Amino acid sequence: MTGTISVDSFVAHALFDSGASYSFVSEDFVSRAGLSVQRLGHPILVSSTNGSISSCSVCQGCSVILADEVFSANLVVISLGAFDIILGMD
């Protein structure tokens, strides 16, 4: 399922993925929204149909507004294609 959400007051095109263990944010969206990035203590290996990549960066405590409800999300920074955000089960 896809949709439009707000992340730290910026509009984001999101994919809702119940099979994802983490939530992700695109490097491009991080730059556009000026999100604060922290280094992870260890890299996270992300597997997809296109192969595997690792990430050492996270945007912690992002405000995500979905259906008028505000949630806090930790978003792992990766290169994404068509989406700004992938919201997983975390």
Give, region by region, the residue ranges found by the protein language model.
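Aspartic protease
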Residues: 1-90
